[in-house]
């Protein structure tokens, strides 16, 4: 994979950088700037090299048209504060404002183009439409650096097509992500434990199938666990359940048994009367969830058991929270897993926190990011990497 060094002398050159600034917002306030901070090493490196840096990124899911609610204005402000230099924000993606903003840059300056998903060609399934937008990007720059790991699984104009038109390289963040994930997937030090959470089994089917041939232990929590419990014949009350996945999960349980992979499920659940922060709740056995209750976290016994398995592993990958960590009453399971990972890291294990929700949980629960070997910025991208899929935005950088 080509690196920034392979691009040669950059002073005076205009470099287009695809970053991942898809940060959570409360109105216009950024509630977690982790993805912006993760982009800083690459951007600072290009600034120090004297390049004119033009950043493109998306935020949220606007419907292919400008929408003030998804403007990158808060991102430009925060990025400027973190870089210690003003960041000019173009009022459009590749239009007159973008051209004026880029033309006004001096060596070492940084500009941000408006939300790339305001242009419907970015995510078009039509190759010609995407290429048209990519050509417009290429007119603005001399080289392209791909540094938005969270989008490398998408065949989009600013991720894939533009790399076919300009001298290109992987940014420092993308290189760090690929290096960390390869270490966990290609030749993991054993025991190798994978913790999977989040709401849906269907989002993790490919990952589970692939990991059943690689991991030593799979620990399952989050909303997806109720489909596993149902597959074992248990009643799960009003908990999240994907009935159409029960047979698939039964197959995974059988396959795990045959291949010697241990699947660890919670033995107790925090069950609530409703999905609410202040809902009355109780700890119940995982096979005795009341019919009128909804499971919102793994229980304390399970949290301790999961953490013990994690502490005994040499490689740990965690993707997805154990419960509704945004509500204090249902955050203990996620906190126990996070603590287990930091303990394992301190004991010399290689640990990866993957997925947007897991990374957000780690930060919101007050854990020091330095307590983990690697915190991935890619949700879907890291999942597809763990599945063993070819990611278009990475494959194009090999050419």
UniProtKB/Swiss-Prot annotation:
On subunit structure and binding partners, the annotation says: Monomer.
One GO cellular component term, please give it.
cytosol
User: What are the EC numbers?
Assistant: 2.7.2.3
Q: Which reaction does it catalyse?
A: (2R)-3-phosphoglycerate + ATP = (2R)-3-phospho-glyceroyl phosphate + ADP
Q: Supply the alphabetized keyword list.
A: ATP-binding, Cytoplasm, Glycolysis, Kinase, Nucleotide-binding, Transferase
Nucleotide-binding among keywords: yes
Superkingdom classification of source: Bacteria
Is ATP-binding one of the keywords UniProt gives this record?
yes
> Which pathway does the UniProt entry assign to this protein?
Carbohydrate degradation; glycolysis; pyruvate from D-glyceraldehyde 3-phosphate: step 2/5
Q: Which residues bind substrate?
A: 20-22, 35, 58-61, 117, 154
Give the species: Beutenbergia cavernae (strain ATCC BAA-8 / DSM 12333 / CCUG 43141 / JCM 11478 / NBRC 16432 / NCIMB 13614 / HKI 0122)
Q: Which family does it belong to?
A: Belongs to the phosphoglycerate kinase family.
MF (Gene Ontology): ADP binding; ATP binding; phosphoglycerate kinase activity
Q: Where in the cell is it found?
A: Cytoplasm
Tell me the Gene Ontology biological-process terms attached to this UniProt entry: gluconeogenesis; glycolytic process
The positions annotated for binding ATP are 204, 295, 326, 355-358
State the protein's name. Answer: Phosphoglycerate kinase
Question: Pfam families, alphabetically?
Answer: PGK
